[in-house]
Amino acid sequence: MDFKIAVLAGDGIGPEISVQGVEVMSAVCEKFGHKVNYEYAICGADAIDKVGDPFPEETYRVCKNADAVLFSAVGDPKFDNDPTAKVRPEQGLLAMRKKLGLFANIRPVQTFKCLVHKSPLRAELVEGADFLCIRELTGGMYFGEKYQDNDKAYDTNMYTRPEIERILKVGFEYAMKRRKHLTVVDKANVLASSRLWRQIAQEMAPQYPEVTTDYMFVDNAAMKMIQEPKFFDVMVTENTFGDILTDEGSVISGSMGLLPSASTGESTPVFEPIHGSWPQAKGLNIANPLAQILSVAMLFEYFDCKAEGALIRKAVDASLDANVRTPEIQVEGGEKFGTKEVGAWIVDYIRKA
């Protein structure tokens, strides 16, 4: 198979972990006889500094013409600390999602047995937890009508039937591939938009008789995720709720540096780590590259290259078992490996496998 990959390294630690993802992908392609070409493009604060736009038209062209995007992270404190800034790095991420029609964000939440001690929750609660959070990406308050003056502000949480149906379809289809349990998360006791979500989910559920479908208010879901994370198989929800719940779910694993994600929809899919740009660690060779590397595994699996994805996951598991880890997940007294060293170890494992 031939792959054409757009690489958007972004800001902060993005360029460092991006390199590791690319090297892992190249090693896997070489091993399995695939051809891969990379085209690099700018985004986020880097793009604002260079051209004044966090997602320039040239970057959009590169993404649109690729088979997939390997994205890293955007964000810079100089924008976070300036409430008057008209252009922000994160707007580039929103623009990419909107222009590429990426309406579904898929985030796996799972624990690694050798790292359960890193979770803030008790080991017996989190060991074996394995579920998907599916978040709608292009509707709701983040994209609705907005207004702000000195005395009043509002954001509009609007959803249409087609937007809800297509993301629920993704949820049901993933549930069919897994343990056949779908939880629809809403706030139907208060919000009209949530009542429409629940109504449509109830209409669609009979089309998937093998799937057990339940409904949960978002506040209850937030508690359940901590109290009983193994309850969930596939969770689907709207944009704002999903943004919060997926970050909460990342805590279960013990490190945001372990979890990848995929954003899919009408055009080129995007694969990325769930963590941010961590600018304080830029250039220090301490960032965990595993989420970026596992994003590459998700990329291969998206294109039905299951053996390739499985090899990457096996290599990551082996690195953890061998205590080849960056500082935030290393055992006490263990050797602290850098970003480059972890990536190189995994590449070497893949080549020798």
Curated annotation (Swiss-Prot):
Catalytic activity line of the entry: (2R,3S)-3-isopropylmalate + NAD(+) = 4-methyl-2-oxopentanoate + CO2 + NADH
Binding site for Mg(2+): D219, D243, D247
Family matches, as Gene3D superfamilies: Isopropylmalate Dehydrogenase
UniProt pathway: Amino-acid biosynthesis; L-leucine biosynthesis; L-leucine from 3-methyl-2-oxobutanoate: step 3/4
Cofactor stoichiometry and binding remark: Binds 1 Mg(2+) or Mn(2+) ion per subunit.
Keyword set, alphabetical order: Amino-acid biosynthesis, Branched-chain amino acid biosynthesis, Cytoplasm, Leucine biosynthesis, Magnesium, Manganese, Metal-binding, NAD, Oxidoreductase
GO cellular component, one term: cytosol
Compartments it resides in: Cytoplasm
Enzyme Commission code(s) on record: 1.1.1.85
MF annotations from Gene Ontology: 3-isopropylmalate dehydrogenase activity; magnesium ion binding; NAD binding
Binding site for substrate: R97, R107, R135, D219
Alphabetized SUPFAM superfamilies for the sequence: Isocitrate/Isopropylmalate dehydrogenase-like (SSF53659)
Needed cofactors: Mg(2+); Mn(2+)
Keyword NAD: yes
Site location (Important for catalysis): Y142, K187
Main localization of the protein described in the UniProt heading: cytoplasm
One Pfam family this sequence matches: Iso_dh
GO biological process, one term: L-leucine biosynthetic process
Role noted for this protein: Catalyzes the oxidation of 3-carboxy-2-hydroxy-4-methylpentanoate (3-isopropylmalate) to 3-carboxy-4-methyl-2-oxopentanoate. The product decarboxylates to 4-methyl-2 oxopentanoate.
Family membership: Belongs to the isocitrate and isopropylmalate dehydrogenases family. LeuB type 1 subfamily.
PANTHER family, alphabetized: 3-ISOPROPYLMALATE DEHYDROGENASE (PTHR42979:SF1)
NCBIfam families named in the record: leuB
UniProt cross-references to HAMAP family, sorted A to Z: LeuB_type1
Subunit structure comment from the entry: Homodimer.
Protein name: 3-isopropylmalate dehydrogenase
Organism from which the protein derives: Bacteroides fragilis (strain YCH46)
